[in-house]
Amino acid sequence: MIRPVFAAALVLVGMSSIAAAEDTLVVYFHQRPPYSARAADGGVHGITADVVTQAMSVAGVPYRWEELPSARQMEVIKRDEMPACGLGWFKRPERETFAKFSTAIYHDLPTIVVARQDDARFAGMPSIDALFADKTLTLLTKTGYSYGAELDGKIAAQKPKARADASDNQIMLGMVSRARVDYMIMAEEEAKDLLARPDLADAKLAIYHLANPPAGEYRYLMCSKSVPDAVIARINQAITPPQ
């Protein structure tokens, strides 16, 4: 027979474990080097992931990484079933209606274009407006993805010839290489990381800089409404402001 005192202790331990689990902040990420990726040591590393890891440690906020596609991250954060944050999101007015945002964790480099090395239409430093106006070019975009306020506005207003795809960027760059589409737009640090991979070594793709390129966007933690303001404040104090 379990003695009453021992049974009570077991209950308290169980309740403590549940409380600890509930107090652990879930931080969602998806495989997107150089921003975030699961490493061989089991941890999550990258430009934005490392900033958050350091901030959580300094702030003393218990957390755990959980891999989830970006579209699912937004759904879960909207539902607000538990305290959770998504890594590296752009801040948008429509997102602020259902989420809280940390201070900025990273500032992207200016936008560039990735296209085939032998495509003369990208020679020199074309403007993004000229590329969008050229109906012989097909832009490849990621389904449900924001390219920043300026580019989102230009895409909506100028309606360039475009095709959307939900694949990861490495697969999408393969589509550019095979001439199924003509170009993608992305931050320069991401493009450099992708083009350095062995899988794209023979892709014959190049980075093209733009005349008057859109400034790089700031990235944030996008959190569900149930994340306490006090927790976000602690995280904010521990984040080193990006340049």
Predicted segments with their positions:
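Ligand-binding cleft/hinge of the Venus flytrap
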Residues: 52-61, 132-136, 141-166, 195-202
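Acidic, polar ligand-binding/catalytic clefts
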Residues: 66-133, 209-214
